[in-house]
């Protein structure tokens, strides 16, 4: 059973983070970046996928909180919503990055090594 190239996967994850943060810095230079968050570890019963990455900025978080308050009439205070949404990469999807073909190939190598006989 082939083993994944863990160093290559780690390097890919690092490069995705660097590229995403640089992209947001270029496109939204006035915004304050506070995090790059991997999320959506996903398998569709056929394939395992590389996680998505969202970049969190204070300004994006403020927009997401406002959206939640306006659309859902949240009973939580603004501070409580900020706290609960700050680390939710899926809610910060406006600044979402995909790993592309390289990420999917890396995920497939992990899937093949972990359970080659699995019915995904």
Where are these regions (language model features)?
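Short N-terminal edge-element motif at the start of the domain
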Residues: 1-37
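Low-complexity intrinsically disordered segments
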Residues: 2, 75-120
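Generic structural motif recognizing short loop/turn segments at the entrances and edges of beta-strands
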Residues: 5, 29-34, 46-51, 81-93
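Non-transmembrane, interaction-prone segments in cytosolic or luminal domains
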Residues: 16-20, 24, 48, 53-55, ...
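Short, flexible coil/linker segments at or flanking structured domains
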Residues: 21-26, 41, 75, 80
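N-terminal interaction modules that seed assembly of large macromolecular complexes
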Residues: 27-68
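The catalytic "switch" region of P-loop NTPases
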Residues: 68-74
């Amino acid at each position: 059973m082939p083993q994944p190239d863990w160093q290559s996967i780690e390097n890919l994850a690092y490069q995705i983070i660097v590229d995403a943060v640089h992209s947001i810095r270029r496109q939204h230079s006035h915004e304050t970046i506070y995090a790059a968050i991997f999320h959506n570890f996903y398998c569709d019963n056929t394939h395992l996928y590389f996680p998505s990455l969202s970049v969190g900025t204070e300004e994006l978080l403020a927009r997401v909180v406002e959206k939640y308050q306006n659309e859902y009439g949240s009973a939580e205070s603004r501070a409580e919503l900020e706290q609960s949404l700050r680390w939710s990469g899926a809610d910060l999807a406006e600044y979402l990055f995909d790993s592309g073909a390289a990420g999917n190939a890396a995920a497939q190598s992990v899937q093949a090594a972990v359970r080659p006989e699995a019915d995904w």
